[in-house]
Amino acid sequence: MTRKKTNPFVAHHLLAKIEKVNRKEEKETIVTWSRASSILPTMVGHTIAIHNGKEHIPIYITNPMVGRKLGEFVPTRHFTSYENARKDTKSRR
C-alpha cells in the first residue's frame, strides 16, 4: 500500500487574510506569526510580514517560493562572529 500525500499546512487565519486582500485587489502587508504555513500559489505577489521571534520582517512572495514554508525566509538567530575573541587573545600575548 502506498502512502497518501497530505495537503500543505496553512493557518486558517492567514488564508482568510489572503482571500480578503485578493477580493479588495489592494496591496497591503499581511502580518503573521505562522512560520509553519506553506506558501501557496494564491500568495504570490503579496508582501507577508513574518515574525522572527522579535519583530516582523516583510517578505515579498515570488513563484520560486511556492511549496516552501514561510519560516525558511526569516532567520531567527543572529550570528556574531568570533573575530572579537581572536583579537582579544592576540592582545594578551
Swiss-Prot record:
Question: Which InterPro entries does UniProt cross-reference here?
Answer: Ribosomal_uS19, Ribosomal_uS19_bac-type, Ribosomal_uS19_CS, Ribosomal_uS19_SF
Segments traversing the membrane: none
rRNA-binding among the record's keywords? yes
Which of UniProt's keywords are assigned here? Chloroplast, Plastid, Ribonucleoprotein, Ribosomal protein, RNA-binding, rRNA-binding
Q: Name one GO biological process term.
A: ribosomal small subunit assembly
One annotated GO molecular function: structural constituent of ribosome
Chief location bin: plastid
- Can you list the GO cellular component terms from the UniProt entry? chloroplast; mitochondrial small ribosomal subunit
Disulfide bridge partners, by residue number = none
**Intracellular or extracellular location(s):** Plastid, Chloroplast
Q: Which domain of life is it from?
A: Eukaryota
Q: What Gene3D superfamilies does the annotation carry?
A: 30s Ribosomal Protein S19, Chain A
Note one Pfam family from the annotation. Ribosomal_S19
Family per similarity comment = Belongs to the universal ribosomal protein uS19 family.
The record describes the protein's role as: Protein S19 forms a complex with S13 that binds strongly to the 16S ribosomal RNA.
Q: Know the name of this protein?
A: Small ribosomal subunit protein uS19c
Annotated source species: Agrostis stolonifera
